[in-house]
Amino acid sequence: MDRPQYVNWIVREDGVVFEDQQPLNCYRLSYVRDDAILDDWALHIRKQYVPDGELEEDAALNKLTVEEYLRQYIIPQKGEPFGPTARSNDISEILFADLFEFILNYEVPRCKQHNRSGKNESEHGTDIIAYRFF
């Protein structure tokens, strides 16, 4: 998977400790408004749901535009039942997967958003798996 440009905005926050003075590894997004990076990020998120090679064909088979197909069948929508929850869960999982893969150099399989039982339903089970070969 290509490294999305927004990953350059992820920075480590030093000096964060838990109540027992145990240091925590924390990260934050330190961003500046850049429409090109935001567009790249949006495309990166969309690719978590449906690969480019399938998108146009699936839309055509359903007699929909790509945008209509994404809204009706793929991307959780904020105005639908459970849509906001699914969107929030998905973006969190994608952000953490990106952190593990592109910042911490782990291998992260990307398949959780593919072939879901419904666009507004998160699949239950393991959210993120990350591993590293030594």
What does each model-identified segment do?
Residues 1-124, 129-134:
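Mixed-charge (Asp/Glu-Lys/Arg
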